[in-house]
A protein has these predicted regions:
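Sec-dependent signal peptide recognition
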Residues: 2-11
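C-terminal motif of bacterial Sec signal peptides marking the signal peptidase cleavage site
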Residues: 15-16
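A short beta-strand motif characteristic of beta-propeller blades
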Residues: 24-31, 67-74, 109-115, 152-159
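Beta-rich, blade/repeat-based domains predominating
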Residues: 31-45, 75-92, 101, 116-142, ...
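Beta-propeller domains
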Residues: 52-66
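Short loop/turn segments immediately following the C-termini of beta-strands
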Residues: 53, 97-98, 137-138
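A short loop-to-beta-strand structural motif that recurs across blades of beta-propeller domains
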Residues: 57-59, 101-103, 142-145
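Short loop/turn segments that connect beta-strands within beta-propeller blades
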Residues: 62-66, 105-109, 146-151
Length: 163
């Protein structure tokens, strides 16, 4: 596993090299209690939302002050978040790769469970018209459309998309 991780880091480094002198690396947060970030996304508020499966939390980071300003965790109903996405209202949703839950926080800050298509749910995105899509990897490999409010069951677009 370590060899694979090193190979991935090397490949990322190799392909991210550029001849431009304008590129620079800037450290946002140091010494933070973030246990490995799996997915991250800038929210409409300009803050960086970082999801951690291992830490089982979502950290909200102000990249101007380099501070973690909020953290959602188990006490907020966040369990093993992997990836994260925002809709046009600024609500954010995440996938939990281990439990299969797709959930988010609505405009009022209440947790909403969109559904549970099963373990391995990983990538998540909203279309321009706020339709929610997720897919699975590792355990299964289906592609689903989810009702963000959780009122209707996940719609299977394609099962076994990897075959």
């Amino acid at each position: 596993m370590v060899k694979l991780s090193l190979k991935i880091v090397f490949i990322f480094f190799l392909f991210s090299c550029s001849k431009s002198d304008d590129n620079k690396i800037e450290l946002f947060v140091s010494g933070a209690q973030i246990a490995g970030v799996n997915g991250m996304h800038f929210g409409p508020d300009g803050l960086l939302y970082a999801a951690s499966v291992i830490g089982s939390d979502i950290s909200i980071i102000d990249t101007k002050t380099n501070k973690i300003i909020k953290r959602y965790d188990l006490s907020d109903g966040v369990v093993g978040p992997d990836d994260i996405a925002f809709n046009s209202k600024g609500e954010f949703y995440w996938t939990s790769i281990l439990t299969g839950e797709v959930a988010g926080f609505n405009e009022n800050g209440a947790k909403v469970i969109a559904g549970n298509p099963g373990p391995g749910v990983n990538p998540i995105t909203f279309s321009d018209d706020d339709r929610l899509f997720v897919a699975q990897c590792f355990f299964d490999n289906g592609l689903f459309e989810m009702d963000p409010s959780g009122q209707t069951a996940p719609r299977i677009i394609k099962e076994e998309i990897g075959e």
